[in-house]
Every structure is written in C-alpha cells, then in structure tokens.
Amino acid sequence: MNTEMTNEHYTIQEKLHILADAAKYDVACTSSGSSRRGQKGELGNAVSCGICHSFAADGRCISLLKILMTNHCVYDCKYCINRASNDVKRATFTPEEICNLTVEFYKRNYIEGLFLSSGILKNPTYTMEKMCEILLLLRTKYHFNGYIHVKTIPGASDELLAAAGYLADRVSVNLELPTSEGLRKLAPNKTMQTILSPMGKVQNTIAAHRMAIGKSSYMERSRGNQFLHNGIFSDTSKQQFQKKLESRAALQRGTDVSKTSAQSNPALLDSSFTWNQAYQLAPHDMSRLKRSFAPAGQSTQMIIGATGESDYTLLQTTQQLYQGFDLKRVFYSAYIPLNEDPVLPEIGTPPPLLREHRLYQADWLLRFYGFQADELLTIEKPNFNELLDPKCDWALRHLELFPVEVETASYAELLRVPGVGPKSASRIVNARRYGRMDFTSLKKMGVVLKRAHYFITCGGKQMYHTPLEETYITRQLVSVDRKESWKMAHANEGFSQMTLADFGIG
C-alpha cells in the first residue's frame, strides 16, 4: 500500500533524507565526459566535477548530489523499493527546492554536480516536464554551469526529451534488464520498445549535432582504440554490425536487444528526431543558451542477479548497446533484495558484488582492450569464473597464443596479456625503440608481473621457469586473487553507501 503524504507533512531536511536514500540504488560512478569549463558570471565547472575522486565502499560515486525528484510512482516494478504497492514514506521536491539544494551544496563543496532521477508521478510526460523545469531553472535562473546527469523517463514526449538533452551533460535511460522476457516478468509497466525508442532518438540527435559542428558522428573513445582493428568501435566491427542488422531486419520485431539492436527497427528510426527538429522542439528561452546536445553522451544501467540471465546475455546486450546506440557507458548494479516476491531472490540473499565486478572488468575489455563479447563468453560457457578476472580466464582458454614476446608483439597483442594495460602496453611499444628491456624495466612501466610472467617472454626468456599449463597457472592466479575476491564478495558487510548524514547533513 502506498503511504501518500503531501509535501507540507515534511520539512526540506526530511524530504532530503527520504529522497537521497531512495536514489542510492541508481549507479552514477563515472567521470563526466564533458570538457566545459567555468565561465564568468556562472556557477560550477563540468570539468572538475566528473573526476570521481570520492567513492563509497561499494564503489558508488558520491561527487554528485544523487537524488530523486519524487519517490511516488505509479509503476509497480517488482525489484524497486519505490514501487506503487510498497508501504514506504513518500515525498516530492518542488523544482525550486532541488535548485536551492544543488546550489547551496555546491557552494559548500559537498557536491560537484547533480544526478537527477525520479519515480513516475502521474505519468511519464508530467514527470519529465517537472524534471526539465528543474534543469531549466538551474541553467538560467541560477546560472549553474556544473555537471548534470539526468535519467529520462521512457514514454515522455519528444519535446521534453530534446529539452533534457540540451540542458543536461549526460542523459540516460535505464534498460534495467537485458531481455523483453525479464521486463515482462519484473517490470510489467515497461517494454523494450518504450526504453529503446528514446535511446535511439538521443543517439541520432547527438550524432546529428556532432556532424553539424564538424565532428565525427560517433562519441570519442580512448586513443588506443585506433590501433585495435578487432575492437567493437573499429570501422570493421561497425560494418559487420550493420550487415548483421540488415540481415535480421525481417526478423526484427518482437526480438530482444541481446539478439539485435533496435537501431535497425524501422519504428525507432521513423520516430527519431534530427538535430534541426530537436532544436525546433526546444523552448525559445532555452535554445538561446546555445548548448551542445548531451555533450557527455548517454548511458544505461542493468540490474544483475534479479533474474536468471547469464553473463553471456548481459555482455552481448552490452556490446549491442555500444555499437547500436553509441553509449558512453553501460553500468551494472548488483541486485539487493528489498521486496518479498516469489520471482525475486529472498530478502537476505547477498548481492552478487563479485559478479558485478567481473562484468565491469569485461566491459572494460570491450571498450579499451579490443575484445569482442563472443571471445570472452560463449553459449557453452555462459558465465565468468568469479575466481579469475575475465582477461586471465580468456588467456587460460587460449594458451596456444602464449607466451608473447614483449620486444616484438604489437600493441593489440600486448593488451591481451594479463597484467598489461593500455598505458603499460604503450610504454613498452615506445621504450623498445630505444633499447632492450628486462623484467625490471617492465615492472617500472606498470606491468603487473604476478599475472603477466606466466604469459610473456622478454628477450626470449621467461621470468621464472613455469609450465604453460592451464591447471597449474589457474591455481597460482586464484591464489594471487583470493584476497581481492574475498574483499569484493564481502564488500557490503559492515559498509554502506555514504549518505548526506555522513557530512552532518540530514
């Protein structure tokens, strides 16, 4: 049952306690991706705010004021603490209240930006209208130039989606679950179509705006990606992806995003608005701000452990989202059982934090290391070995490619060695132009030798005489990572996400 109370029953401090606590399950641990610096006569700086220097013990970023506009919700998603059928305290901020909180907290150096989300108040369009009012007040009346990440509401009108894109640095639509079946099971008020449609509109508008100012239609990626010809952002992979979409066009309707991207869906393409259309949709008092459209791109979030989807399904969905919608980030949130329901894990079940960690590592391999999802997992092996990081797991299944000689290997080959990252691989490639290397110099370059020495040679020699045998190396690597894995799996014991009360507020 809903506990409905009007705003006069709560003070600002009480609302803050309720709505900041209700927002903690939204993931926002990322740099802003925006390079807009402070300007004379305006408040805030989008450059410094997104550095993510403050994290809670569970990895969530606390540099943003992460808050809900309201936790009233007409939807009844089974996994959500704010679902309509739950008996919880309900509160709603007015636009002015959120603006005042944001500005005052920024002046006191508590926060460096705003992460704004909301439950569904009345209907999606009404809710999104109120959220856009908040953003417009911050940018115009309060001259707030800091970083803003807004969660858009699926089902809201195109005009409001365009307004949010102009006013915020990053916009996102939570996918929540990777399959239509999962959504039908746990979120009966949502459909894959209503989620992917605004995602496609935002992507097309970002691309159109970037081309209008002389940039590539695709978001900027790590500079190292230009050397990864097999990576998911390479021209070859993009062409292969488009061919797959074309071949599946006839079977598109009614399929899951994990099988194909909605970008090839004619319904989505027809409803996507162009840059000029978005500009015309923007209110006149907003369009004169001459802002970029979502300069930090868009992101999404998927819940881990609420349903039975495998890591393979999640990772395939992730790759399709990156390639089909040019997302800047995909976030994963280990499900914390909060509601009693026969289709959900029992209350008290530990959240799969280590699994979440492995998915983030795999996501990193897709974005920076040139891996494809089907290289890391297959239908026959659909889940990661939680005792090993995904890169080590892949290397152990492909020992025929090792050892790699560091003095002759390409940048792409070095990146596939456990313990070698983009920075250390780049340093190796640059250093070997000036002389020979040894394992001491590799360590100084940042190579993690406790993992890498099993898979590399330097000058034709191994660091130690170790057998290139899967069982032996697996046992050694599991022993090395055991302490880290235990800490990750038990990260929620004795710790919790920092709240405003930790700063003496609320």
Regions found by a protein language model. Name each.
Residues M1-H72, V448, I456, Y464-E493, ...:
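Flexible, acidic/Gly-rich N-terminal and inter-domain linker regions that tether
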Residues K66-L68, E96-K107, D285-M286:
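Short, charged beta->alpha transition segments
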Residues L64, C77, L116, V173, ...:
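Conserved, mostly hydrophobic/aromatic
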Residues V343-L415, R451-G506:
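Long, highly charged, low-complexity intrinsically disordered interaction regions
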Residues C99, K122-Y369, E375:
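Conserved AdoMet/S-adenosylmethionine-binding subsite of the radical SAM
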Residues I67-E96:
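Canonical Radical SAM [4Fe-4S] cluster-binding loop centered on the CxxxCxxC motif
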Residues V103-S117, A362:
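Short Fe-S-cluster ligation motifs
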